[in-house]
Amino acid sequence: MEHLERSIAEGLLSIRAVFFRPNEPFTWASGIKSPVYCDNRLILTAPEVRTQVESALCEIIRADYPDVEVLMGTSTAGIAHAAIVGHMMGLPMGYVRSSGKDHGRQNQIEGRLEPGQKVVVIEDLISTGGSVLDVVNVLREAGAEVPGIASIFTYGMQKGLDRLAAANVKNHSLTNFDVIADVAAKQNYIHPEDVARLIQFRNNPSDESWIGGKN
């Protein structure tokens, strides 16, 4: 597993899908300031890494969720990955909107889903876990069984881990924040001394003392 995590991290770094700004952090929609931004949409433009990622998602889904019947992508970043993996595995797929449409059938779930079907959610990354749990809840309210999530990257934040555990949702990510930081330092994408600041952020995102190397 460690080999896979490092291999995926190397792939993401090689296509510059991971950005590091410990001195001028990114601001998330939640208001959290982060030294790292992972744009997994760039995977779609890199065939070799895309094949690696989608094949790995297939492997973990087969291993962790052998009874899966449907794949559901999160809107919008998880849709393409769910479509590719669904094709590779011969499984139906759909996706869940952040809110229902205000026209047509006003669907929030796109694709055919029957009550009782076992669904795995495909997500590109997990931070605090809020958005992916919204998707899980929509699917469960529609009668689906959702044993878990397959994701490309996780920040490994305690808040996200606690939320998923409380909802009885398993997550299996291909790689994680600590591995990305370690590989990035070893391959000179970031200074080794910045790794501690990145981990400080991950451990307590509300504490901004890591910004600019402040203590």
Task: Describe the predicted segments one by one.
Residues 1-122, 130-215:
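PRPP-associated nucleotide enzymes
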